[in-house]
Regions:
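Hydrophobic/aromatic residues in alpha-helical transmembrane segments
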Residues: 20, 58, 89, 98, ...
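Helix-capping/transition residues at the boundaries of transmembrane alpha-helices
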Residues: 63, 103, 107, 152-153
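Functionally important transmembrane alpha-helices
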Residues: 137-197
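Alpha-helical transmembrane segments and their helix-entry boundary regions
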Residues: 44-48, 101, 115-116, 158-162, ...
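Residue-level signature of the transmembrane alpha-helical core
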Residues: 11, 49, 53, 84, ...
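Specific transmembrane helices
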Residues: 1-91, 176-234
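Aromatic-anchored segments of alpha-helical transmembrane domains
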Residues: 56-62, 120-129, 166-175
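Function-critical hydrophobic alpha-helical transmembrane segments in multi-pass membrane proteins
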Residues: 74-133
């Protein structure tokens, strides 16, 4: 069963990352690094969910209105909950690696910009094929990673980036069948994208769409402005 096999593989990845995180957090850092930062966790989850949903919704709605995207039915592939659990494990493990212990450790000694460069290089090492999807696809993937770094910096927690990353992956991959996380490509809705490649995204679908690129860029601007405002207020205080 492909769904179970992927769940098992992602479960192993998650277990390894959880052990790595807890080991270094407790044995090396003696719990001095706040990775999860559960204070205001409801707020963190809420910000994360909105950040993950926004680019999908703001891309799908215009495409549906101008009929570049058409709905043609429901795909009853089965094992939906197992696929969702696999996405959950994959996302949590990825966030523990990219914006968990390493992000907090580097951020303790360096500024946000160099830490983001390091995390982006690590992200590229995990996804070496993103440039094969074209310029817009690569830009969307890199901006998505940058948004999550901004989110981690803004909330000082891995919880918000995880929530954003999970809901985005669940919607784009499992619901709309756009983002390719698994070779089997499970999806719930049968959608057809047609017309101008800049809008339809071509083979990359939503992640290859210029509307998605604009949405990701606006999210980056929003969090950069929020961080600047917070820094200004802290200096005044």
């Amino acid at each position: 069963n492909a769904a179970v096999s992927n769940l098992w593989r992602e479960g192993v990845f998650f277990t390894v990352m959880l052990i790595f995180t807890l080991l270094f957090k407790t044995a090396v850092e003696h719990n001095r690094l706040k990775i999860f930062n559960t204070a205001n966790k409801f707020r963190h989850y809420s910000i994360g969910l909105i950040t993950g949903i926004a680019p999908i919704v703001l891309t799908v709605l215009p495409l549906f209105i101008i009929r570049t995207l058409r709905f043609s039915g429901i795909n009853r592939s089965g094992n939906t909950l197992i696929w969702l659990a696999a996405i959950f494990m994959n996302t949590l493990a990825t966030e523990l690696l990219l914006r968990g212990y390493l992000f907090r450790l580097y951020r303790k000694y360096y500024g946000f910009a160099p830490v983001t460069v390091i995390i982006t290089l690590l992200f590229l090492s995990m996804n070496p094929g993103i440039f094969k999807g074209g310029i817009i696809y690569a830009a969307n993937m890199l901006l998505g990673n940058f948004v999550l770094c901004l989110l981690a910096e803004y909330t000082r927690s891995v919880l918000a980036p995880f929530a954003a990353h999970f809901v985005y992956n669940a919607l784009s991959s499992l619901v709309f069948g756009s983002l390719s996380l698994f070779d089997e490509k499970p999806y719930l809705l049968k959608l057809t994208l047609s017309g101008n490649r800049l809008l339809s995204g071509g083979d990359m679908k939503l992640e290859g769409c210029i509307i998605m690129l604009i949405c990701q860029s606006l999210l980056c601007v929003f969090f950069i402005l929020r961080l600047k405002k917070r820094g200004h207020n802290m200096r005044r205080a």
